[in-house]
Amino acid sequence: MIRIGHGFDVHKFGGEGPVIIGGVAVPYEQGLIAHSDGDVALHALSDALLGAIAAGDIGRHFPDTDDKWKGVDSRELLKDVYRRVKEQGYKLGNADVTIIAQAPKMAPYIDAMREAIAHDLETDIRNINVKATTTERLGFTGRKEGIATEAVVLLIKQ
């Protein structure tokens, strides 16, 4: 049996950089405003994993009303989510993450993001794809007000 999950997240810029995305610190003049470290890529990926096992979203499991999660490293959240996936008898088939941002430029950091995600999801890097695109200066991402990310995962019953 296979299951598919989709996730989406967005955070606006504010404060000081760097931007933490895909488990990697990307130099930029601003960071992302969030209760956790604001890693939109890992938040979308975590939501996709939770969606695939019909377990809600990260807001349900790690609410921003709980100070326990204030400033938390999103890689720890992702690992916890993947533990839940494995408890349901699934493993990751593949994941595809799309980062939507006018800035900062992501290309130099994509390989490091893939490595971090593959490590945290206990899989081969060939099962992880990360790509970045812009909105051609349209909308809030085009105006450099924030970053959005979408993620899709395929889970395989073990």
From Swiss-Prot:
Keywords: Isoprene biosynthesis, Lyase, Metal-binding. One of its GO terms (molecular function) is metal ion binding. SUPFAM superfamilies: IpsF-like. Binds 1 divalent metal cation per subunit. It catalyses: 4-CDP-2-C-methyl-D-erythritol 2-phosphate = 2-C-methyl-D-erythritol 2,4-cyclic diphosphate + CMP. Pathway: Isoprenoid biosynthesis; isopentenyl diphosphate biosynthesis via DXP pathway; isopentenyl diphosphate from 1-deoxy-D-xylulose 5-phosphate: step 4/6. A divalent metal cation binds at D9, H11, H43. Involved in the biosynthesis of isopentenyl diphosphate (IPP) and dimethylallyl diphosphate (DMAPP), two major building blocks of isoprenoid compounds. Catalyzes the conversion of 4-diphosphocytidyl-2-C-methyl-D-erythritol 2-phosphate (CDP-ME2P) to 2-C-methyl-D-erythritol 2,4-cyclodiphosphate (ME-CPP) with a corresponding release of cytidine 5-monophosphate (CMP). NCBIfam families: ispF (TIGR00151). This is 2-C-methyl-D-erythritol 2,4-cyclodiphosphate synthase. It comes from Vibrio vulnificus (strain CMCP6).
